[in-house]
Amino acid sequence: PQTVRGVIARSKGAPVELTDIVIPDPGPSEVTALIATCAVCHTDLTYREGGINDEFPFLLGHEAAGTVESVGEGVDSVQPGDYVVLNWRAVCGQCRACKRGRPQYCFSTFNATQKMTLTDGTELTPALGIGAFADKTLVHAGQCTKVDPAADPAVAGLLGCGVMAGLGAAVNTGAVSRGDSVAVIGCGAVGDAVIAGARLAGANKIIAVDRDAKKLEWATELGATHTVNATETDVVEAVQALTGGFGADVVIDAVGRPETWKQAFYARDLAGTVVLVGVPTPDMRLEMPLLDFFSRGGALKSSWYGDCLPERDFPVLIDLHLQGRLPLDKFVTERISLDDVEKAFHTMHAGEVLRSVVVW
C-alpha cells in the first residue's frame, strides 16, 4: 500500500479536505494510476452535496489523465508507463446490453474491487469509481484508455466526463451530419462540447442559446455560428427565425430543466431530434399536450456519457485534437493545484470557467 494526498468530501455540503489516503497495491484486473491532471466537474460538486448517494466519505475527482504505475495479476490491456485517460465505462462484455451490441448501455461496468481508505481504515467511495483528485488512484484496468502521449494531459483528461458527454451527444446520440442545423441550449462546458461536436460532424448552422453573454462568447469560439440570448428573446422563435421558419434538425438541451426541454422540443424542425444531456433533478416534472408529440414526429433521446465507448472514441478524438480539428484546449480556463478544489467549485458554480484543471 501507498499513502498519498487526496481530496475528500467527508460529509454532506461540508467543504472538501486535502488529506492522506491509502492506495492498496493492485489486485487482479486492477491498476494503480499516477495522476497528471484532473478537471473539476459539476458531478464532483453533486457528490459533495449528497446528490448522488450518501456513501460518505467520497474521494472526489474523475476527469483525469495520467500514466499507469503498476498493474495487478491478469492485466494485459495496459502496462506500466502507458499514457491513459481514465473512464467510468469499463464495459463488462457479458450483460444483456453488451451481448446485444450496445455496450454503451452496459449496466455491469467494472471498477476496482479493493477499497482505498483514509489512514484510519475508513473506506472511501471514489467518485464515478475513479477518485482522481489524488496523487494516485486505484481503478479497474478497463477504466484506463490509452491515447497518444503527445496530447497535453490537461486537455486529454477532459474526455473522461463532461467534454465527452457533450461531443457524444452531438456525434453519437444526436447523429448530427453534414449540412444539419443544430441548436444547443445551455453553453457551459458540456454545451460547448456539443457545439464542438456539431462543428466536427459538419453542421452548417450551430445556434448557441444561453442567458449569459460571456458563455455565448465562449460558444462562438468553439464553433457556434449564431447566438441567442435567452434573457432578451423567445428562444423558440429565435431558432425558427434562424432556420427559415422551420426549426433546427437537432436540438440539444444541455441544461436539463422542464422549461429548457420544452424549448428544445418546440425549436426543432418537424421530425427533428431532441437530445437531453443536461441532468434533471428527481423532482422535475413535465406537462405537455400528448398530441404535440404525436403530430411532430422525430426522435426524443437522452444521452448518458455521450453514448461513448471509451476505447473506440477517446483515441480518435485525441487524434482529431492533435490534427487541429477539435479545439479541446479552449475548455481549459485555468490550471490549479490540488488544494484549490474547494475554491474551484465556487468559480464553477458562478459560471466563471469552462474547466478548472488540477495539474500535478
Curated annotation (Swiss-Prot):
Name the Enzyme Commission number(s) assigned to this protein. Answer: 1.1.1.306
* Cofactors required: Zn(2+)
Q: Which reaction does it catalyse?
A: S-(hydroxymethyl)mycothiol + NAD(+) = S-formylmycothiol + NADH + H(+)
Give the record's GO CC terms. cytosol
What the entry lists under CDD domains is as follows: Zn_ADH_class_III
Q: Which residues bind Zn(2+) 1?
A: 41, 62, 161
Superkingdom field:
Bacteria
Task: Identify the keywords attached in UniProt to this record, alphabetized.
Answer: Metal-binding, NAD, Oxidoreductase, Zinc
Q: Which top class of enzyme applies to this chain? A: oxidoreductase
Alphabetized PANTHER family for the sequence = ALCOHOL DEHYDROGENASE, ALCOHOL DEHYDROGENASE CLASS-3
State the protein's name: S-(hydroxymethyl)mycothiol dehydrogenase
Organism of origin: Amycolatopsis methanolica
